[in-house]
Structures are given as C-alpha cells and as structure tokens.
Amino acid sequence: MIRDIQDEIMRLKKENDVCILAHLYQNDAILEVADYTGDSFALAKLAQTVPNKTVLMCGVRFMAETVKMLAPDKRVLLSNPDAGCPMAEQMDRAVIEQVKANYPDYTVVAYINTCLLYTSDA
C-alpha cells in the first residue's frame, strides 16, 4: 500500500515538475520520495537553486514560509497546512512590541525557526 502511494507521488511530482523537500524528522516513507532532505534552513537555501517552479515542503509552517522568503519566485506548497511547531508558535507578537517599546535602543533577534510574522517584527 505505501509503495503504491509512493509510486503515485513520484509520478505526480515528475508530471507536475515539483521538487519535494523533506525535513529530517519526516518518516521514512516521505523521506524516500523526497528530492532533498535536511534541516529547515538548508532546505530553504536549496529551494533557491532547484529548477522546479513548485516546491512541496514536508515540514511545518515556518519552514514553508522560509522557503518562500528565500525563493519568492517559487510556488511553495506545504504538505500539511495545519502542521505547526509549538516552539515556534509560542511567541506572542504583543510581547515583541512591548519589549521594543520598553527598550527602544535594543535589537530584537529572532531565530530562523520562527514564524515570519514574528521575524518581521524583530
């Protein structure tokens, strides 16, 4: 059953010129159909260089956002639009705004594994 699904994915990605990027924590069945595997930043940088116009990110939301930020000319799809990272999503935008208001001479720094909504405020 899994092999049949993988075969269908391979056929569709070739037919639709899609590059599949998979974060290392994905299960083996997904890693086997991926064109590239790696950590989130390495995959986002790699997306800039692939010839495909469409990239399917098998990971969480911030990973797809980072791919789109670094490769704005690509159509970026997320394998599961509800896939989020609890750590990346625990930040509150109001907290960032409050810190910036209280400490205007300080610089807010956001890690790459942060939703773009918050990164843009840093």
Language-model features: locations:
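Metallocofactor- and cofactor-centric catalytic cores in central/energy metabolism, strongly enriched
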Residues: M1-T66, L70, S79-A94, Q98-V109, ...
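A short alpha->loop->secondary-structure connector
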Residues: D73-K74
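Conserved small/polar residues in nucleotide/adenosyl-binding loops
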Residues: Y118-A122
